[in-house]
Amino acid sequence: MYEIRIHGRGGQGAVLAGGILATALVLEGKYVVAVPSFGFERRGAPVASLLRFDEREIRQMTNIYHPDCVLCIDPTVARAVNVFEGVKDGAVLVQTTAKTLGELQLPPQVATVGLCDAVSIALDIFKRSITNTIMLGAFARTTGLVSLESLQAAIQKSDFRDAGLTQNMAALARGYEATQVHRIERAQAA
C-alpha cells in the first residue's frame, strides 16, 4: 500500500487535488481511499488531504500517520505544520518552491525530491497562486506512480470553480515539464 499526504492551505485546492489524484489512480485500476482532513478552517489555514492506494482492496480507513510521499502545494505551509511528521524511510517529497535542493532542510528519511516553482506557473496561467493541478503534474513526474494521461482524464471529470478546463490541462502539463527530480544519496552509518 502507498500512502500520500497532501499539504496546502484552505482555498488552494488540496482536497480537490486529492480527489483528482484518486480518480486518476482508479482509472489505472488501483484501489483508492481518499480522506480529506479539514474542519472549519478559514481560507489560508493549513489543510491536508490523505490518500492511500494499492493493487488490492483497502480496508484501512484510518488517518495516514506514516506517509510514503508528502505533496506540498503551498511553499509556506511547512512554516505552520510539520509536513515531515512520521514520513517513512525512503520518503518522497514533492514541493512547490523556487528554492534549489541545497536551500531546503530535509529530514534524513527523504530520498527523492521533486521541486516545481508552481507559484510562478500559476501566476502565469491563472493570474493567482492556485497550484493544485500544477503540483499533480509534479507528482506524476517525481514518482511515476500515475500517468499524465490518467490525470488529464481525471481533470476532465472535475468541476473547477476558479479556472477552466483548458487552463488546468495546461497547468498539469507545465507542472510535469517544469519539475526537477533529485535522488538523495545518504551516507550509510558505519
Where would I find each of the regions flagged by the language model?
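Active-site cofactor/cluster-binding pocket
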Residues: 1-190
